[in-house]
């Protein structure tokens, strides 16, 4: 599936990079630039800030758009990309049949209606972590990010709604075998969009990746 392919591609050799000594490393790079770090170092360089949800509504992020005007919105594009048995595609991108795997809870799903497409870093969490200061266009780009396979993932509605807007300090996927992958993907999305972490989130990430393979996290900055 898309996420596994992306992580496999990230095992290429990394250039040496000296980590900053101060607590808040600041911006990680320019839009279009790249950065690759071992997972545990990637956690260290995420910018630090306290969270704020003042002014947030879900409509602050225009999502499920059809950027390429092919009749399939972002949700449908993810479902088509992640199906391991392709669904039939009808008028207006109506999907029937097909089969998917939900890694959050280790469940196979044979109907698109049983799936949610989850933002790896939820919209509310993104707002808390800096997106509240972005332009409407940047928030729309974030909510429909098909440029990185880790940003959006098809999972069971039940597991997605259990997660809601929580970060890894309070929620991890029920499937323990997927947790290290989940943490790596979470960090990658935060890096890609240069989203901040608060103290509790960084501590939780640090503690939880301690038992994970220290594999590289490679991103292209979206902003």
Q: In which residue ranges do the predicted regions lie?
A:
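Secretory targeting and sorting signals
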Residues: 1-24
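Active-site-proximal flexible loops/turns
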Residues: 11, 77, 125-129
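Short helix-loop boundary/capping segments at the starts of domains
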Residues: 13, 84-88, 106
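N-terminal module-boundary/linker segments of secreted carbohydrate-active enzymes
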Residues: 21-69, 201-203, 210-223
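Short, motif-level signal for alpha-helix interfacial/capping segments enriched in acidic residues
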Residues: 45-46, 91-106
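Glycine-rich, flexible loop/turn motifs
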Residues: 52, 68, 74-75, 113, ...
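N-terminal carbohydrate-binding/catalytic regions of secreted carbohydrate-active enzymes
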Residues: 54-96
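Domain-level detector of nuclease and nuclease-like folds
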Residues: 100-223
